[in-house]
Amino acid sequence: HSPDNNCLAIDVSDPVGIQMLLKQFNVKLVNAQKYIELARSIKSDDELICMKASIETAEKGMWLMRDKLQAGMTEEELWSYMHKVNIENGGEWFETRLLVSGPRTNPWLQECSNRVIESGDLVAFDTDMVGPYGYCADISRTFVEGNRLNDEQKRLYSMSLEHINHNKSLIKAGLNFREFAEKSWKLPDNCYDNHYPCIIHGVGLCDEWPLVAYPNRDFSNADYSANFEENMTICVESYVGEVGGKEGIKLEDQFVVTKDGLKQLSSFPYEIDI
């Protein structure tokens, strides 16, 4: 089909397939992920319907986890309720195992374990759930065992909520990533080294492009040249945890980009509002 172009983009293949391909054909292989994710970044109306179904299922699981949360159970026991609800409702799989409690909430990105949850612990999680129809529900919340935040937990929670609310208020179709990153909410110095890797990322069949990295001091750590476009679906991220601190707060919500701003797809309330 293209005799003068021997470049072939491949998404996924096993090693044997690659060996056979290179043996039989004179091709230059490149990673197809960035091209595929760019093509998937603008969602159709049908895709949004599928995504909303996945989010609805995820939030059922989140409510069940909040109802079941109690001191004496393990992180893995609590996390199992998310899997139960996803499978019961025709869902598929989870990208990660991000549910942690107490001191394991700081720093972020530790994997779910058999640690026993204690009275008053924060319990933070990221759904990363591929639900019904194969679309991802990517929502983060931080619960507290006993349903009552102490003063320090409230302080961290309020900062994380301010982080989310400020950043989501900036985004609309046409906004450049660099302008957004420059105007985005900045963590205090004692939290900077614990920052989440990105401010926002795309979401579809899994976590996808676009991605706006959490900026370093001179914005040299990533490519900020693209723009937000209408019907992109994105997640706005926040993690607030002081370096060396006891606990941390993880929040994340899912949105669709419009010409007038963001339309929120996730609806689970924040702990500070319940």
Where are these regions (language model features)?
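Active-site neighborhoods and metal-handling regions in enzymes and metal-associated proteins
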Residues: H1-I274
